[in-house]
Curated annotation (Swiss-Prot):
Protein name: Large ribosomal subunit protein eL32
One Gene Ontology cellular component: cytosolic large ribosomal subunit
Family membership noted in the UniProt record: Belongs to the eukaryotic ribosomal protein eL32 family.
Gene Ontology molecular-function annotations: structural constituent of ribosome
Lineage, highest ranks first: Eukaryota, Metazoa, Ecdysozoa, Arthropoda, Hexapoda
UniProt source species: Drosophila acanthoptera (Fruit fly)
Length: 134
């Protein structure tokens, strides 16, 4: 049986489109990642009509749904079994995510212990090798 979150509201994002960098469509050397314009005459910085929008605090998410996954849980990065036990009392609000650098042996231990503690993991099948019959 899967663990369900204690509270699962509808997550509303005020803006789903990415903020893109000014003139990144014009020059290939400029990446699309957002950079704040600093120029004295810059149209985007001065917020002229028809220009790219700048990110600001008004686009922030609801405080209760910030950092929430679509499942209704918040993510907690787990590197070993001991860190997993922190989630014992919070297993209806937080779910564990096994860190990238954890070996497959330790991953098995973490997955087993999570099942015992009834803690949900976001990536329980990641890098778990099954033995092939030869």
């Amino acid at each position: 049986m899967t663990i369900r979150p204690a509270y699962r509201p509808k997550i509303v994002k005020k803006r789903t489109k990415h903020f893109i960098r000014h003139q990144s469509d014009r020059y290939a050397k400029l990446s699309h990642k957002w950079r704040k314009p600093k120029g004295i005459d810059n149209r985007v910085r001065r917020r002229f009509k028809g220009q790219y929008l700048m990110p600001n605090i008004g686009y922030g998410s609801n405080k209760r749904t910030r950092h929430m996954l679509p499942t209704g849980f918040k993510k907690f990065l787990v590197h070993n079994v001991r860190e997993l036990e922190v989630l014992l009392m919070q297993n209806r609000e937080y779910c564990g995510e096994i860190a990238h650098g954890v070996s497959s042996n330790k991953r098995k231990e973490i997955v087993e212990r999570a099942k015992q503690l009834s803690v949900r993991l976001t990536n329980p099948n990641a890098r778990l090798r099954s033995q092939e019959n030869e």
